Amino acid sequence: MQISIIQKGLEGWRGSILVFGLLEGALESQLNALKEICTPASLAKALQDKEFVGKQGDLQSFQLIGKEPREIVLIGLGSAEKLVLDDLRKATAISCRKVIGQEGTLGILLPWDIFDSDIAAKAVGEAVILSFFKDNRFQKDPKQKKLPNKLELLGLPESSQKYLSEIVPICSGVKLARELVGAPPNSLTPSALANQAKEIANQFGLEAKILGQEECQAKNMGAFLAVSQGSDLSPKFIHLTYRAKGEIKRRIAMVGKGLTFDSGGYNLKVGASQIEMMKYDMGGSAAVIGAARAIGELAPSGVEIHFLVATCENMINGSAVHPGDIVKASNGTTIEINNTDAEGRLTLADALTYACELKPDAIVDLATLTGACVIALGEELAGLWTNSKHLSKELKESAEACGEGLWEMPLQDSYKEGLKSMLADIKNTGPRAGGSITAALFLKEFIKEDIAWAHIDIAGTCWTDKDRGINPAGATGFGVRTLVNWASRSINP
């Protein structure tokens, strides 16, 4: 989609569809701006059809016969005093769903001056592209609905144009993550995920290293390989590297959980555990690879970034790991596996150990790790655990800037008692109470004390069963935009 700024606003504008945002109250004075393109009589008639007062979510549209624009969509924004940036994203998404099926030039006019206009322009541009997303790759005869092919943001200063260049790369990363999560497990295998990572590396000049089973064995990745041994498909360890040109001010690592399918192993997923949805157990790896795609194109300065994924399936065969087995991670820690369905943390144990060996300034891992996090925070907030106040601040600011919900949770050290094993150094699960906290504490065992680390549990946020904000039903691509924002902020630690 081509995106541009039209400084003059509605003066002389003749696009195909106009989205016009209205604040609650004083509608008449705001609607005066539309006199450039339609008569007061047509406006009055449209508003008589349905009560429209400008509340958030109020929506009204009407057509102009024989004129351009051919349709005007009025969207309520609510009170100016309560309006936040994410309200613009949501209003934009609602409006975009209204115009699916139409083509041409989409113009959007909102009260930009309430916010930093540059930031608002970027937020709205992202909302348009991401709300139009539709994944129909696996249909015999996909019906491609018509969509606008041009977006014009009306009434913004020309200076905002430079920020628009970031929109398409970021949205391309999010869309890639959505496609990866949405792909069925017979399509997205560990090898297919590794091949996708290599394609990203080749396209954007990243370094790529893919380790097979023997190479992982040579690195003593006993925890990761224990999970993979029940599958007929070979595990892969993915390592992409982005290095900015010039001076490197900060080295960071992004680690994603990459279970392309999770049966639960011998602790088989049954009943309400939604085994049929366990294709999305690689949502963390999708976010990391999507971020790699966006960062590769954006090419931020001053930073070196390592993207790491240990990918495999968790299946059942004669070689599958047993409940009660003891395995050794690559840092030497022995782990009693008291639940084979707590496999993601086993793969992450070796991935985080590998990340620490790169001596980064900070590590962030993303994982669809626990149902406990979903129970605690629902489907709009991801959980954040970290050993660094500064990293916490960076990530929360990065998430807030793009409208991704992040809520910090405690690393309650006393809960580590629940991970004690009679035989090994540690168990892979603790008691049911505080399950998301003990999962984070388990991961912390594989982080060196001098490295800033954060764990983000995206179990509730990587998928939505219904349209929500800028996310159509399906995979959300959650985490990509937060990671990209964090990468750009990382040059000023």
UniProtKB/Swiss-Prot annotation:
It is found in: Cytoplasm. It holds the Pfam family Peptidase_M17_N. Mn(2+) 2 binds at K257, D262, D281, E343. It is an enzyme of class 3 (hydrolase). GO terms for cellular component: cytoplasm. One of its GO terms (biological process) is proteolysis. InterPro entries: Leucine_aapep/pepB, Macro_dom-like, Peptidase_M17_C, Peptidase_M17_leu_NH2_pept, Peptidase_M17_N. SUPFAM superfamilies: Macro domain-like (SSF52949), Zn-dependent exopeptidases (SSF53187). It catalyses: Release of an N-terminal amino acid, Xaa-|-Yaa-, in which Xaa is preferably Leu, but may be other amino acids including Pro although not Arg or Lys, and Yaa may be Pro. Amino acid amides and methyl esters are also readily hydrolyzed, but rates on arylamides are exceedingly low; Release of an N-terminal amino acid, preferentially leucine, but not glutamic or aspartic acids. Mn(2+) 1 binds at D262, D341, E343. Its cofactor is Mn(2+). Keywords: Aminopeptidase, Cytoplasm, Hydrolase, Manganese, Metal-binding, Protease. Its EC number is 3.4.11.1, 3.4.11.10. The active site is at K269, R345. One of its GO terms (molecular function) is manganese ion binding. Binds 2 manganese ions per subunit. It comes from the Bacteria. Belongs to the peptidase M17 family. Presumably involved in the processing and regular turnover of intracellular proteins. Catalyzes the removal of unsubstituted N-terminal amino acids from various peptides. This is Probable cytosol aminopeptidase.
